[in-house]
Amino acid sequence: MADVEDGEETCALASHSGSSGSKSGGDKMFSLKKWNAVAMWSWDVECDTCAICRVQVMDACLRCQAENKQEDCVVVWGECNHSFHNCCMSLWVKQNNRCPLCQQDWVVQRIGK
């Protein structure tokens, strides 16, 4: 987000005391010089960490990092909406065809970055 620096934007606060002797009119309580907006981005998945290798799913897994194959490491989502690295999950399903988190039968919903 861009910084807001359009001169002096003023904000007048109303008195919380409710007394009749409070200041009114054009008296400024403070002047806002600069404002840095901050935003958060959220995924549509329950967890953003691969439960098998404990690395964030949008980063390459440990094996792909060690073999320098970061671009080949993609994310796989199950019908249970849990996400893992595809290479981690492909090894997992050879031993156990269930989701490591919820133990439902593993069915691939989609694969991609």
Swiss-Prot record:
Its EC number is 2.3.2.27, 2.3.2.32. Induction: By 1,10-phenanthroline. The modification Phosphothreonine is found at residue 10. Pfam families: zf-rbx1 (PF12678). InterPro entries: RING-box_E3_Ubiquitin_Ligase, Znf_RING, Znf_RING/FYVE/PHD, Znf_RING_H2. One of its GO terms (biological process) is protein K11-linked ubiquitination. One of its GO terms (cellular component) is cytosol. The keyword Metal-binding applies. Phosphorylation at Thr-10 by CK2 promotes its degradation by the proteasome. A zinc finger (RING-type) spans 61-103. Keywords: Acetylation, Cytoplasm, Metal-binding, Nucleus, Phosphoprotein, Transferase, Ubl conjugation pathway, Zinc, Zinc-finger. Its main location: cytoplasm. Zn(2+) 2 binds at residues 80, 82, 99, 102. Catalytic component of multiple cullin-5-RING E3 ubiquitin-protein ligase complexes (ECS complexes, also named CRL5 complexes) composed of CUL5, Elongin BC (ELOB and ELOC), RNF7/RBX2 and a variable SOCS box domain-containing protein as substrate-specific recognition component. Also interacts (with lower preference) with CUL1, CUL2, CUL3, CUL4A and CUL4B; additional evidence is however required to confirm this result in vivo. Interacts with UBE2F. Interacts with CSNK2B, the interaction is not affected by phosphorylation by CK2. (Microbial infection) Following infection by HIV-1 virus, component of a cullin-5-RING E3 ubiquitin-protein ligase complex (ECS complex) hijacked by the HIV-1 Vif protein. This is RING-box protein 2. It comes from Homo sapiens.
